[in-house]
Amino acid sequence: LPVRGIRPVAAIAPGVSGSTGLTLCQLAGAMVEAVRPAALICVDSLCSTEGARLGRSIQFSDTGLHPAQADHARHLDAGMLGVPVVAAGIPTLMEAEEGADLVVTPRALDSVIAHGSALLAAAINRALQPRLSVAQLCWLTG
């Protein structure tokens, strides 16, 4: 399939801050400074208040991302990064009960993440590459 008109896109998968020693805010700030993107799309798992939503919805927001880290004052948003920030995610956990230090996840979490991430990736790729057909996007992402 010939592919023309691909828009430039950069991506990173920062992982868990405990393994890198850097917070998501630090990594995103450095990336924005180095790449100078038109916008930033942040994908993360989300915490739900209702069990019925776990793995059954996809949420998008143009107000940025509020990482569940100890540094609650640092949010990934346009005010902090200087570019529009779109957050996308799938609710995959919820707090067990008020005041408890436990979280609940779906029993089929691996399946929820595999299917949900594929759907979310397809939607983001389609939004970022509107000139490409679905067949071309499938071919590119293999």
Region spans (language model):
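Glycine-rich phosphate/diphosphate-binding loop of Rossmann-like nucleotide-binding domains
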Residues: 1-11
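Hydrophobic/aromatic beta-strand patches that form the interior of the parallel beta-sheet core
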Residues: 10-12, 39-41, 84-89
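Metallocofactor- and cofactor-centric catalytic cores in central/energy metabolism, strongly enriched
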Residues: 18
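Conserved nucleotide-sensing/catalytic segment adjacent to the nucleotide-binding pocket
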Residues: 23
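Glycine-rich phosphate-binding loop
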Residues: 26-75
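Short, flexible loop segments at boundaries between secondary-structure elements
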Residues: 70-93
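C-terminal functional extensions of proteins
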Residues: 86-142
